[in-house]
């Protein structure tokens, strides 16, 4: 992709309304544009990142055995009256009427709809277990949306819902998502710590929030420092191995970790002083087991092996991809701009042509772009008629993992300069070695 033909509306000045780093950098880097309070358009660069985040989430959901579907954003109020949540949910729910005066709503969550879908098709325990997920836009009318996509009114969510015959099966489903979330966040370059949390309006008696530590976090968290060194479950983990998953969850919940709502000062004091961490955190995922809270009132029942009908046990599991983009920036940036982890970067390489119009430099850049793309790398070539300093600043701001710097002086010596954005390390390599070098780094 040539930057001269791309749509990248970079801002030179820091927007006054941006309170936190991620909001400032997403606006400055031309990733998003605010359309109304808490509502953003995702511009091309931002959308590429958002899509890469959802790819990782989808891959780990599929690996765990969850099955993707897609539910609509508009829901019937009648479903919510069945569960008893229509009046209880409050003003965050955007309530609307269609032309026939039927009461509808813009879905803030999907427990009711997924339960209705399930009950219409599943009648027997032989069709269990099931875990269904979707990735869809939601709307919650926050009183005070702030911090950009970190706390917006419209946001993208991955919601998964598990259905099991009994509590034992439901807890195994919960453990599957617990492990899938650990792997998801690690692949996104985040160190997430699962913490005991309140269930809130979702309900239930078992819940964990996945928290990343960040100075700009909206909540106070308390945990044992040992979590920072815990190993992530491998891709080879068997999600059907009940004992192995339980052992992993037991290990990841063996030490103290709690949000402020669940904090127990006496228990925290029992943690060795050198291991105690009281910090700010950002919630990047939330999982719940809520038993028969929705299946009971909504009639989602199956016939068990004894021939008796019973309500299914359910859980729900949420990750916000649009919120995650901001969280990744909060965790990975410097004074110059964003530092994208390789797994979610919008492009792998920023190819900087330092002398546009010079025949040799233009030809070298064209050849390098072709070779890099043939090697499986995505490339954004800065072919704008700008001074080198402006190109370096843009490359640092948008944070692509590698910068390939092409200028007449280096070409005269048969060399190219490479810069690793995350570390700032630079190296000089032969022109023909660039593509093999970066392909090897990606692998």
UniProtKB/Swiss-Prot annotation:
It comes from the Bacteria. InterPro entries: aa-tRNA-synt_IIb, aa-tRNA-synth_II, aa-tRNA-synth_II/BPL/LPL, Anticodon-bd, Anticodon-bd_dom_sf, Pro-tRNA-ligase_IIa, Pro-tRNA-synth_IIa_bac-type, Pro-tRNA_synthetase. Keywords: Aminoacyl-tRNA synthetase, ATP-binding, Cytoplasm, Ligase, Nucleotide-binding, Protein biosynthesis. GO terms for cellular component: cytosol. One of its GO terms (biological process) is prolyl-tRNA aminoacylation. Its main location: cytoplasm. Catalyzes the attachment of proline to tRNA(Pro) in a two-step reaction: proline is first activated by ATP to form Pro-AMP and then transferred to the acceptor end of tRNA(Pro). This is Proline--tRNA ligase. It comes from Methylobacterium nodulans (strain LMG 21967 / CNCM I-2342 / ORS 2060).
């Amino acid at each position: 992709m040539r930057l001269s033909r791309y749509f990248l509306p970079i801002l030179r000045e820091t927007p006054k309304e941006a309170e936190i780093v991620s909001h400032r950098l997403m606006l400055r880097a031309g990733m998003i544009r605010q359309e109304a309070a808490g509502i953003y358009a995702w511009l091309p660069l931002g959308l590429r990142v958002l899509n890469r985040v959802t790819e990782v989430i989808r891959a780990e959901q599929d690996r765990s055995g969850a099955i993707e579907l897609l539910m609509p954003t508009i829901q019937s109020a009648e479903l919510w009256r069945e569960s008893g949540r229509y009046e209880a949910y409050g003003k965050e729910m955007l309530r609307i009427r269609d032309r026939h005066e039927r009461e509808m709503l813009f879905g803030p969550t999907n427990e009711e709809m997924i339960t209705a879908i399930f009950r219409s098709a599943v009648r027997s325990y032989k069709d269990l277990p099931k875990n269904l997920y979707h990735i869809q836009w939601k709307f919650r009318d926050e009183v005070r949306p702030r911090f950009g996509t970190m706390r917006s009114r419209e946001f993208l969510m991955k919601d998964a819902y598990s259905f099991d015959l009994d509590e034992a099966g439901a807890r195994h489903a919960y453990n599957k998502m617990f492990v899938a979330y650990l792997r998801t966040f690690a692949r996104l370059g985040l160190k997430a710590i699962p913490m005991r949390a309140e269930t809130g309006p979702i309900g239930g008696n078992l819940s964990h929030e996945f928290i990343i530590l960040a100075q700009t976090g909206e909540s106070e968290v308390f945990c044992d420092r040992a979590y920072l060194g815990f190993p992530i479950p491998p891709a080879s983990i068997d999600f059907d191995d009940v004992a192995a998953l339980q052992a992993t969850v037991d290990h990841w919940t063996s030490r103290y970790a709690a949000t402020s709502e669940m904090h127990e000062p006496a228990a925290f004091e029992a943690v060795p002083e050198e291991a105690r961490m009281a910090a700010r955190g950002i919630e990047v995922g939330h999982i719940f087991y809520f038993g028969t809270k929705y299946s009971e009132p909504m009639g989602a029942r199956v016939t068990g092996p004894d021939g008796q009908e019973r309500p299914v046990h359910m859980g729900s599991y949420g990750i916000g991809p649009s919120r995650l983009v901001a969280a990744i920036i909060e965790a990975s940036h410097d004074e110059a701009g964003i530092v994208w982890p390789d797994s979610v970067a919008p492009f792998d390489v920023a190819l900087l042509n330092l002398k546009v119009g010079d025949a040799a430099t233009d030809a070298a850049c064209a050849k390098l772009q072709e070779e890099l793309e043939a090697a499986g790398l995505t490339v954004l070539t800065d072919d704008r008629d700008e001074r080198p300093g402006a190109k370096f600043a843009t490359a640092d701001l948008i944070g692509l993992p590698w910068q390939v710097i092409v200028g007449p002086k280096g070409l005269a010596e048969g060399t190219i300069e490479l810069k690793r954005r995350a570390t700032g390390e630079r190296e000089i390599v032969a022109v023909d070695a660039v593509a093999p070098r970066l392909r090897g780094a990606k692998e």
